A protein has these predicted regions:
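Conserved catalytic motifs of ABC-family nucleotide-binding domains
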Residues: 156
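Conserved ABC ATPase signature
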Residues: 135-139
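Conserved ABC transporter NBD signature motif
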Residues: 64-72, 79-80
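ABC ATPase "signature
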Residues: 219-220
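Catalytic Walker B motif of ABC-type/P-loop ATPase nucleotide-binding domains
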Residues: 160-163
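Conserved ABC ATPase "signature" region
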Residues: 104, 108-131
Length: 260
């Protein structure tokens, strides 16, 4: 990975995604920078996963452009894909395989020489230094998700994509996974994650895009978003006699609550 921190690793410009007569993504634009965690925050069905799928090249988009590390993902899909890491679902792996066997398998798929030093570094990055010889099925749900994170970073991509990475985890496992995601930022990766958790968005994201009905409504840091849109949320905050929160802003902009 050789990219300057703060430079864009992903640029999404005016894309539309349509399934039959249903437009799932409508004129969406945003970018993700190296060393940044960017969150797509919205309820189920808002268009988050469809947007990620368009970036990954799994679904066609009707208009607009998507570039990853400068490569157009339609014109140069192989180069774009080589610069992208995707967190796989925990059900993607055989439970009888050992952790190191899974990592070696995917390093081979990615064309990466996973020597002993690199293997130990990957395990250290996800806090599983002592679990190399454990079977995947013996790991907790949070540990399994961390193995998926290691696979996403195994070829040192500039962009890492995480689709609701902590869904189904208990609070402690969620916090542990957030620490690992923040570690990706420190290493200079650009991270694009989707979430319907307000807590997750505020805990790990440098910038947030609120998305609803396939449209991006606002993009800011959590703090600036609260300040800029507090006028839309002051009545909601006053009703519970508290300060304006990001959730108040979300309700003010979309007209609906977002539950974790």
């Amino acid at each position: 990975m050789d990219i300057i921190k703060g430079s864009p690793v992903l640029q999404v410009q005016n894309i539309n995604v349509t399934y039959g007569n249903f437009k799932a993504v409508r004129d969406v634009s945003f970018d993700v920078k190296a060393g940044e965690i960017f969150g797509l925050l919205g309820p189920n069905g808002a268009g988050k996963t469809s947007t990620l799928s368009a970036v990954e090249g799994l679904v066609k988009y009707d208009a607009g452009t998507i570039t990853i590390a400068g490569f157009d993902n339609r014109k140069e899909p192989l180069n774009a894909r080589a610069n992208m890491g995707v967190q796989l679902q925990s059900t993607s792996f055989q439970t009888e395989l050992k952790v190191q066997e899974i990592l070696k398998l995917y390093s081979g798929i990615c064309g990466v020489d996973l020597n002993k030093q690199r293997l130990q570094q990957l395990l250290a990055d996800i806090g599983l230094e002592d679990s190399a010889h454990k079977k995947y099925g013996e790991l907790s749900g949070g540990q399994q998700q961390r193995v998926s994170l290691a696979i996403a970073t195994i070829h040192e991509p500039v962009l890492i994509m995480l689709d609701e990475p902590t869904t189904g985890l208990d609070p402690q496992s969620r916090r542990q996974l957030w620490e690992r995601i923040e570690g990706m930022r420190e290493k200079g990766h650009g991270v694009l994650l989707t979430t319907h958790s307000m807590e997750e968005a505020e805990a790990v994201c440098d910038r947030i895009a609120i998305i609803d009905h396939g449209r991006v409504i606002a993009i800011e840091t959590p703090e600036i978003m609260i300040e800029k849109h507090k006028g839309d949320a002051e009545v909601i905050a006053a009703s519970r006699k508290g300060k304006v929160t990001l959730e108040d802003v979300f309700i003010g902009l979309t007209g609906k609550a977002l539950r974790n």
